[in-house]
């Protein structure tokens, strides 16, 4: 018999997270490392666990994640998005609660491109009167 698992893909900035929810006791493993060793900052760990805490499913699923691209914040947001999508696959009645919290919406904000004639996306070269 196949093991029950729920898959979800999350994205944020340049990060892509492939999330699997497996019935378990609430262990979160990211790229074969525990969440405590992968994310040093407590705020990033809180972001990852938000959907599980909101729906009260923290102790019902083990979360297995493969994430690549981007930085820490983008990866945390991508994991949260992936966990949310997987939770909705596991139980459709959680959708309104997660939608209201804004976890189902893909954050569209991306890095603005650098324009020629400027130092960065908006930073102009220093102006000199003389």
Swiss-Prot record:
Signal peptide: none
Pfam families according to UniProt: Ribosomal_S9 (PF00380)
Keyword set, alphabetical order: Ribonucleoprotein, Ribosomal protein
Ranges of compositional bias, category Basic residues: 111-130
GO annotations of cellular component type: cytosolic small ribosomal subunit
Molecular-function annotations in GO: RNA binding; structural constituent of ribosome
Protein's recorded name: Small ribosomal subunit protein uS9
């Amino acid at each position: 018999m196949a093991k029950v698992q729920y898959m979800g893909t999350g994205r944020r900035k340049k990060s892509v997270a492939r999330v699997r929810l497996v019935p378990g006791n609430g262990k979160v493993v990211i790229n074969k490392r525990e969440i405590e060793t992968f994310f040093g900052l407590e705020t990033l760990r809180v972001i990852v666990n938000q959907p599980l805490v909101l729906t009260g499913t923290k102790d019902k699923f083990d979360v297995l994640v493969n994430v690549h691209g981007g930085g820490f914040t983008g990866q945390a947001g991508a994991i949260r998005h992936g966990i949310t999508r997987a939770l909705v696959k596991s139980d459709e009645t959680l959708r309104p609660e997660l939608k209201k919290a804004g976890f189902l919406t893909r954050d569209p904000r991306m890095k603005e491109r650098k324009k020629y004639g400027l130092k960065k996306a908006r930073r102009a070269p220093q102006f000199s009167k003389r």
